[in-house]
């Protein structure tokens, strides 16, 4: 199965925000600071007020992180990423082609495939992924078919 699309800034931003939101490390860190805020404020406030303070700490951390991502990703050097892509599920590998290069990633070397609102991500490792936006597919059925084919290749290679 072959899909052609142009990866845009908003696709890249959505991927990064959701990648962080679903990250256990980020969640544990943010929740840890929230618990610390609760604990430090509990000594001089009611439990309810301390809980609200802890929740606000968590929300403020995201309110800082997301604008940081917007700026950081906008000014990054991403011309070889934010371009037209052709991806294909081949028998032995996941194939990606842009005007800058071609890559083959054998199925055994792919870490995981995830489906999130707005995209499918083919993770090569914990920090590198191919992002396929939902708009690249002609229908939700085609997206599901592509995802099922990817998962099938991963399952049979491991």
Mark where each language-model region is:
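Generic beta-strand structural signal
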Residues: 88-89, 115, 124
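Conserved beta-hairpin
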Residues: 63-104
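Phosphoinositide-dependent membrane-docking surfaces
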Residues: 8, 94, 103-120
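A membrane-cytosol interface segment of integral membrane proteins
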Residues: 121-158
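N-terminal membrane-targeting/pre-transmembrane regions
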Residues: 1-37
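Hydrophobic alpha-helical transmembrane segments
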Residues: 36-58
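Alpha-helical transmembrane spans of integral membrane proteins, capturing the lipid-embedded, hydrophobic core
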Residues: 31-35, 54-62
């Amino acid at each position: 199965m072959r899909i052609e699309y142009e990866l845009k800034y908003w696709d890249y931003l959505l991927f990064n925000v959701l990648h962080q939101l679903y990250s256990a490390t980020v969640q544990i860190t943010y929740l840890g600071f929230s618990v610390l805020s609760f604990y430090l404020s509990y000594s001089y406030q009611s439990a309810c007020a301390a809980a609200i303070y802890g929740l606000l700490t968590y929300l403020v951390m995201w309110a800082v992180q997301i604008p940081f991502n917007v700026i950081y990703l906008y000014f990054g050097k991403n011309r070889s990423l934010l371009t037209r892509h052709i991806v294909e599920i081949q028998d032995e590998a996941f194939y990606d082609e842009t005007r800058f290069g071609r890559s083959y990633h054998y199925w055994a070397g792919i870490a995981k495939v995830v489906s999130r609102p707005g995209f499918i991500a083919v993770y090569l490792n914990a920090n590198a992924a191919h992002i396929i936006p939902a708009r690249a597919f002609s229908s939700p059925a085609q997206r599901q078919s592509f995802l099922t084919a990817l998962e099938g290749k991963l399952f049979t290679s491991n």
